[in-house]
Amino acid sequence: MNYTEAVALAKAGDERGYGFLYETTYKSKYYLALQYVKNEETARDVLQEAYIRAFTKLDMLAEPEAFPGWLGKIVANTAKNVLVKKESHAVF
């Protein structure tokens, strides 16, 4: 299976598509999140939120083969948002 096939399956609600997308990207995206947040538990939380965002917005993905890079941007943005929230709570 490739990303184009997996995205098509996921868009159709087929768990095999979601599974492929998750299994082939989890490890690298976990380490990406960890680089930002510096905490394993927080990195897992970031990933959970990022995958939910990505999977609910698959229709916005113009090129399915670009899924790993697209997801990477979502992970990075989610991690940055988490850091901003933590900083704002620390200020008050």
Residues covered by each model-derived region:
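Intrinsic, short, N-terminal disordered tails of RNA polymerase sigma-factor systems
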Residues: 1-5
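A short, charge-rich alpha-helical start-of-domain segment used by transcription regulators
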Residues: 7-31
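A short, glycine- and basic residue-enriched loop/turn
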Residues: 15, 40, 44, 58-64, ...
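Structural recognition of an alpha-helix C-terminal capping motif at a helix-to-coil junction
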Residues: 31, 45-52, 56, 65-77
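Arg/Lys-rich amphipathic alpha helix in sigma70-family domain 2
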Residues: 59-63, 76-92
